[in-house]
Amino acid sequence: MFEHRLRRPFLVGLLCLVASAAVAATPDAGDWLQWRGPQQNGISTEHPLPSTWSPKGENLLWRKPEFASRSTPVVMNGKLYSICRAFPETTQEGEKIVCVNAATGELLWETINNVFLSDAPAERVGWSSVVADRDSNSVFALGLGCYFQCLDAETGAVRWAHSMSEEYGMLSTYGGRTNYPVVFENLVIISGVMTGWGEAAVPAHRFVAFDKRTGQAVWFVSTRPRPEDTTYCTPILTNFAGQAAMVVGGGDGTLYAFQPRTGQVIWKYDASNRGINTTPLVHDGIVYCGHSEQNAAAPDILGALFALDGRRKGQITEQDLLWKIPGRTVGRSQPILIGDRLYATDDGSALWIIDT
C-alpha cells in the first residue's frame, strides 16, 4: 500500500514540539533542515531560547502524541516533517511521512507506505529522519523498508522513489538501523549495507548519489566488503582546504571522507572492527568522532573518542591522530564543541568534557 493524503480534517498521529517563540514568517528563519541543525553540530543559532519547558504546558506551543516517533523532526518554511507509524497495532500497519503546520500542529498532508523485506519491529519505524531541501522545495526520506522517496514539500506528492531493497539489495535488519540522506548541490546521497550481483554480490556498506530532481543515479561506491554491522551514522558535509568533503562512519568500522560530487575517497581511518554509528563533528578542519566497539588497533579495548586533521589524504594511521582517548564508549551521540571544550555523552549516559 502506497497512499497519499492531503489536508485531512483530523489528526492520525504526531510528536511533541517545544517552541521558543512564534514560528518565523521569513522562508529560512528558524529552518532546521536536517536533524543536527543548520550547522550540522546540534547547536541552534536562534535567540532567545527557553531555559525551561514541561510537557504539561510550560513553553509548550502544541502537543500531538498521536504522531510520536523516534525520528527527529525537521522544519522548513513553517512546516514540520517527520516519519512515524501508520495504523499501529492493526493489520494495515505501515509507516508514514507527515507534514504539519509548525505553528499550530495542524496536519497538512501525509504519505503512507508499506514496510516490507525487513525484519525490524514496528517500534523501530522512524530510525532515520526526513531531510529538507530549500533549493528543490523537496523532502527526502528513507523508510524502514529501505523505500527512498523525494516528496514535494508543499503537497507531499511523490516526485520520484526507489525501492532500495529491490533495486540495490539494501538490507533492513532487525536492528532497524537505516541511514540519513544528505543533500549536496544537485545530489542527494543515501547509503546502507547492500548486496546485489557481479562486483556488488558481496555485502558492503555502499553509497549511492542520485540527481535530487530526477532520481537518476549519478555515482555508486563501495566500502570494505563483509561489514559486521548496519549503521545509522549521519554524513557531515564540509570542506578541507577548499575541497568539498562528506565525512561519515561506515559499517566496516572505518571513518571516511568522500568527495561528494564523485564518491572518490579522500581519506579513511580504520577506527573500529565494527560499525560506526556516531555522527562525526567537524570544526575548523578538525574531525571529532567516537565509537563503542572494539578498537581496530587494540581489539581488547572497547570504545574511543578521537580527533584527526581532516586535511590529510589517503590512509590515516593511529600515529596521525591529533589525540585519542581509548575506552570511552561514545557510540551513539554526536559530540558538541563549545569553545575549546568537547562535550561527549557515552553509552552509559556519562558526560565527558574534553579540553581539545
Q: Can you describe what each PLM-predicted range is?
A:
Residues P9-A21:
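Bacterial N-terminal signal peptides
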